Amino acid sequence: MQAACWYVLLLLQPTIYLVTCANLTNGGKSELLKSGSSKSTLKHIWTESSKDLSISRLLSQTFRGKENDTDLDLRYDTPEPYSEQDLWDWLRNSTDLQEPRPRAKRRPIVKTGKFKKMFGWGDFHSNIKTVKLNLLITGKIVDHGNGTFSVYFRHNSTGQGNVSVSLVPPTKIVEFDLAQQTVIDAKDSKSFNCRIEYEKVDKATKNTLCNYDPSKTCYQEQTQSHVSWLCSKPFKVICIYISFYSTDYKLVQKVCPDYNYHSDTPYFPSG
């Protein structure tokens, strides 16, 4: 009765190891053959294994708990040892037969930072509701990346009233004076260079139920307007100036966006 287990590990390096684990009837010990030269190792392995162990012994299996044993005896001839150069030639030939994997084409990286949205429609909005007027103003600012930026506004209103939206420097005084709302001081003209680029106003009229008395019908005017300013540098900061006048309500408001939100250079207001 004998049992033999072999584990052969072949590493393609200057040193090749062959580990043999065998439990034999005569000694029951394991042999470990190791050599620094691959050529001498191969010769030593094949000659020793041909003397001590044959294929018939290697394939002989004994199953515990069974009476019958199966033995296979095959004719085995000692192979000719391969040199180290033969192994490297075989490795080179097998590598050449493998087709290289096609590389996936990568899309070129496209920089999308040319147009930088400084403020979106939701960042600035003004909603005014009175008995006779319902007003909503939204705006956004877009930096074009070439030293200029645009300011866009859209305004929807239902009812009667006078609405004015303009861009002013931070030094603009908030006051109920229509004549001075678009005046820019001479000292601010160098740092404030904006002009109207696009403007469109659509108006319509309809009769609806009055807000203050649903039993009555009121004449209402609906207005939708779009306006855009184109500003160029150098500039410090711009503010949005809104003035609203109606028969029962007046409002003047100046809003200066926080430019530290989008600019690497902090803005320190003066005045």
UniProtKB/Swiss-Prot annotation:
Segments of this protein annotated with the region III: 98-176
Record's GO cellular component terms: extracellular region
IV (linker domain) as annotated region, ranges: 177-185
Subcellular localization: Secreted
Glycosylation sites: 23, 68, 93, 146, 156, 162
Span list, region II: 22-97
Chain positions covered by the region annotation V (Cys-rich): 186-271
Gene Ontology MF terms: signaling receptor binding
InterPro entries: Nxph (IPR010450), NXPH/NXPE (IPR026845)
Signal sequence segment: 1-21
One Pfam family in the UniProt entry: Neurexophilin
Main location: secreted
Keywords attached to this entry: Glycoprotein, Secreted, Signal
Job of this protein: May be signaling molecules that resemble neuropeptides and that act by binding to alpha-neurexins and possibly other receptors.
Family the UniProt entry places it in: Belongs to the neurexophilin family.
Protein name in UniProt: Neurexophilin-1
